[in-house]
Design a protein with these regions (language model features):
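Bacterial N-terminal signal peptides
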Residues: 10-22
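N-terminal secretory signal peptides that target proteins for export/translocation
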Residues: 1-7
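Kelch-like beta-propeller repeat domains
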Residues: 15, 26-350
Length: 350
């Protein structure tokens, strides 16, 4: 269950400090599926063709894993696929017409101290043939953005990167850098990019979802790309691609958090897990909350069994899968307590 056995005791201490989620019994709707073969944090989930694909992964020393796994709910089995061509982390991942798109991220600098170097790489993965294809690069280099699809185009929003004119090519917790409101759209039909109206609240590590051709960006991290005291936000903003405008602020997320898993189902956006750091604690969440854009209202759902951040999540049918992740907040003394847990929330369960 935990791949760093030396740190299991540390986890028990951390667990005692975790923020409590609403008082539901997770046994009511959550269940377990086949564990993830290579427990990792900073993995991203996307459903395509009735299967769940988990990509990415980050190990000790900020080493990107470039994992690609396919999960089949019909057989409850995982199959390893070809690794990502470029070993990067903190990606934006989405799917369109059965193809999976990976945008931006961070890599290790080739020289100098270990850090996060923002990239502009874009890739298309074809699950049917297990092949990768390089696409036109993003107009701007950034990591930890979020991506979704509206009307056949891919919107990549937010992220973290350097200040204009900075001599740094990478970012680090000890060096000044910034969150981004950048909004760029990719057209797969022409393999071209276009820059759109920036998001009013610059942020990264946010959840995103498209409902009725509008894009909702939820929570995330402001100020910089690394978890820090007060960096989480509860802000929810909506973008209308048809008129290239951002609307007024919407109902705030009840639990301000970043590095969550998420998925969209039946016109609602579900946000799961995440991490936090305050003056008195650092930890991860079990909380599960859903946002209904039609009513501009939040609801709480049964909590996960395991608190974690950097998990992969998405819906297959009416079941939300939340896979792997790190049970500790990043940046602390024991930052890689990874779990292979694959939890499933069945919205139709009674």
């Amino acid at each position: 269950m935990f791949k760093n056995k030396y740190l299991q005791y540390t986890f028990s201490i951390v667990l005692a400090l975790m923020l409590l989620a609403p008082g539901f019994s997770s046994a009511q709707k959550w269940s377990r599926a086949a564990p993830f073969p290579e427990a990792s944090e900073e993995v991203y989930g996307i459903a395509a063709g009735g299967k769940l694909y988990v990509l990415g992964g980050l190990g000790p020393g900020w080493t990107a894993k470039g994992l690609v796994y396919e999960y089949d709910p019909a057989t409850d089995q995982w199959i390893k696929k070809k690794n990502m061509p470029l070993l990067s982390h903190h990606l934006a991942v989405t799917q369109l017409n059965g193809k999976i798109y990976v945008m931006g991220g961070f890599v290790k600098p080739e020289k100098g101290p270990t850090a996060w170097q923002p990239i502009d790489n874009a890739w298309e993965y074809d699950p049917a043939n297990d092949t990768w294809k390089a696409l036109a690069p993003l107009p701007s280099k950034r990591g930890s953005p979020s991506a979704t699809v509206v009307n056949g185009k891919i919107y990549v929003i937010g992220g973290g990167g350097n200040f204009p004119g900075s001599k740094d090519t990478s970012i680090h917790p000890a060096r000044a850098h910034r969150a981004l409101g950048t909004n760029e759209v990719y057209d797969p039909a022409t393999n071209t990019w276009e820059t759109k109206a920036p998001m009013p609240t610059a942020r990264n590590h946010a959840a995103i979802g498209a409902v009725n051709n509008k894009i909702y960006v939820i929570g995330g991290r402001v100020g910089n790309a690394f978890i820090s005291r007060g960096s989480n936000t509860d802000i929810v903003e909506v973008y209308d691609p048809a008129i290239d405008q951002w609307g007024p602020l919407l109902a705030q997320m009840p639990t301000p958090r970043s590095a969550v898993a998420w998925g969209v189902n039946r016109g609602k956006i579900y946000v799961v897990g995440g991490e936090v750091r305050t003056n008195v604690m650092a930890g991860t969440y079990r909380a599960v909350e859903s946002y209904d854009p039609a009513a501009n209202r939040w609801s709480s759902l049964p909590s996960m069994e395991f608190p974690r951040h950097g998990s992969a999540g998405d819906f297959i049918g009416n079941k939300l899968y939340v896979v792997s992740g790190n049970v500790q907040s990043g940046g602390g003394p024991a930052t890689h307590i990874e779990t292979d847990v694959n939890e499933v929330l069945d919205l139709d369960a009674k």
